């Protein structure tokens, strides 16, 4: 699990979409959701001709780069316990809505280790 998207957020396999290549990942909805699909031609047209869409996309990409950077740094510098506690503080709703095995995978730990961490934290 490399990414968890909550309500009113978006996700994609951007490399696959923009470069017209098969994706190296799959995207799975864990709950019913509204799916919006756009083809590359329409996407590029909107990006070039619609200022609001261009700003939306730019802000989205900027936020995603920051999230990815933080996630990578956390994986390298924080212990599994610290990553779990950070998740508790920053995204507590994930613990209610996402099955634990996905959260464990996202945190870079096994489900068993996740259970031990949860038990030790209380």
Model-found features: residue ranges?
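Generic signal for short, ordered secondary-structure residues
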Residues: 6, 22, 40, 62-63, ...
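Phosphate-/nucleic-acid-contacting segments
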Residues: 78-122
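Residue-level detector of alpha-helix boundaries and kinks
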Residues: 12, 68-69, 88
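Glycine-rich loops and low-complexity Gly/Arg-rich segments
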Residues: 28-31, 54, 60-63, 102, ...
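Alpha-helical bundle regulatory/interaction domains
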Residues: 42-43, 49-58, 62-68, 76-77, ...
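Cyclic-nucleotide recognition modules
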Residues: 1-59
């Amino acid at each position: 699990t490399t990414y968890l998207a909550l309500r009113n957020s978006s996700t994609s396999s951007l490399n696959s979409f923009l470069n017209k290549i098969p994706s190296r990942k799959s995207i799975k909805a864990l709950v019913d959701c509204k799916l919006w699909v756009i083809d590359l031609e329409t996407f590029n047209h909107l990006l070039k001709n619609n200022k609001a869409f261009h700003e939306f996309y730019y802000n989205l990409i900027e936020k995603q780069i920051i999230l990815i950077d933080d996630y990578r740094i956390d994986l390298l510098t924080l212990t599994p316990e610290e990553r779990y506690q950070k998740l508790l503080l920053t995204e507590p709703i994930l613990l209610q809505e996402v099955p634990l095995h996905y959260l464990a995978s996202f945190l870079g730990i096994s489900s068993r280790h996740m259970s031990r961490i949860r038990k030790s934290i209380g």
